[in-house]
Amino acid sequence: MGRSRSRSSSRSKHTKSSKHNKKRSRSRSRSRDKERVRKRSKSRESKRNRRRESRSRSRSTNAAASRRERERASSPPDRIDIFGRTVSKRSSLDEKQKREEEEKKAEFERQRKIRQQEIEEKLIEEETARRVEELVAKRVEEELEKRKDEIEREVLRRVEEAKRIMEKQLLEELERQRQAELAAQKAREEEERAKREELERILEENNRKIAEAQAKLAEEQLRIVEEQRKIHEERMKLEQERQRQQKEEQKIILGKGKSRPKLSFSLKTQD
């Protein structure tokens, strides 16, 4: 019992440490992604600010130039101060330049305040987004931790389902291969049977032709034997006839037998 408990505790510690390492790596990757997003947003914001500043400068410069033109067109050549003295054009130009510089300073300060406010708003927005993202990540981790067993069961179920599907597909593939092999074997057997039948037919035809040739040869041999017998009989008959004639001739020559003719002699008288 003690050994099993120690083994289970070591397994659980190893599992917890591996899960902790996985969580730490996920949090590090998320922090790196956040830092990259923050840097990109800052660079985009700085570009927007520079464009805004350039537009505002050009706008203020154009406005100052237009004001100077209007003042030149509307201002009289000389002015009189409160004491009735004529004010020279030089002093009026100095006042205009001073007023324009003050307006430029005021515009620059206003633009600076606007930029400062935009930067502060952007920082607040980024901090809010960061906190929201951290809160969402924390909630997601908590939810994943709560649903860990359910997720593991779902993963195991999907793995088992995929395994069953793969086993089924493998069995179907093996069955298709077996059927294909059976069909190929059947086709080979059918082809061999057809070849065997063709060979048997050819052999039968050859045997029939050989039998016919042998029968014709036997008939021809019988005919030759019969002709030879007839010739022999004819020879025998001729030989017997020749012998008979020879005997007859011998009998005639030797005078044997009744068949010898009588000789008659007669004398004729002369008148």
Swiss-Prot record:
Q: Where is this region: Necessary and sufficient for RNA binding?
A: 1-72
Q: In which organism is this protein found?
A: Mus musculus (Mouse)
The GO molecular function terms of this record are: pre-mRNA binding; transcription coactivator activity
> Locations of Basic residues compositional bias?
1-29, 37-58
Native organism taxonomy:
Eukaryota, Metazoa, Chordata, Craniata, Vertebrata
One GO cellular component term, please give it.
Answer: mitochondrion
Q: What does this protein do?
A: Dual function regulator of gene expression; regulator of transcription and modulator of alternative splicing. General coactivator of nuclear receptor-induced gene expression, including genes activated by the glucocorticoid receptor NR3C1. Binds to a subset of pre-mRNAs and to components of the spliceosome machinery to directly modulate basal alternative splicing; involved in simple and complex cassette exon splicing events.
Q: Which protein, by its recorded name, is this? A: Arginine and glutamate-rich protein 1
User: Phosphothreonine occurs at which residues?
Assistant: 61
What is known about its induction? Post-transcriptionally regulated by autoregulatory feedback loop. ARGLU1 protein binds ARGLU1 pre-mRNA and stimulates alternative splicing to produce two alternative RNA molecules. The first includes an additional exon between exons 2 and 3 and is rapidly degraded by nonsense mediated decay. The second, a stable intronic sequence RNA (sisRNA), retains the entirety of intron 2 and is able to bind ARGLU1 protein preventing it from stimulating alternative splicing.
Arranged from A to Z, the UniProt key words for this protein are: Chromosome, mRNA processing, mRNA splicing, Nucleus, Phosphoprotein, RNA-binding
Q: Does the keyword ATP-binding apply?
A: no
Q: Where is this region: Disordered?
A: 1-112, 236-271
The protein's location, in the record's own words, is: Nucleus; Nucleus speckle; Chromosome
- Motif LXXLL motif 1 extends across 170-174
GO BP = mRNA processing; regulation of alternative mRNA splicing, via spliceosome; RNA splicing
Tissue specificity statement from the Swiss-Prot or TrEMBL entry: High expression levels in the neocortex, hippocampus and thalamus but low expression levels in the midbrain and hindbrain (at protein level). Ubiquitously expressed with highest expression levels in the central nervous system and low expression in uterus and pancreas.
Name the segments for region: Necessary and sufficient for transcriptional regulation.
73-271
Q: What is its main location?
A: nucleus
> What does the UniProt entry report for the null mutant?
Embryonic lethal between stage E9.5 and E12.5. Embryos at stage E9 show a developmental delay of about half a day and their brains show increased levels of apoptosis. Conditional knockout in cortical excitatory neural progenitors and their progeny results in microcephaly with mislocalization of neural progenitor cells and increased levels of apoptosis in the cortex.
Gene encoding this polypeptide?
Answer: Arglu1
Q: Which residues carry this modification: Phosphoserine?
A: 58, 60, 74-75, 264
InterPro entries in UniProt: ARGLU1 (IPR033371)
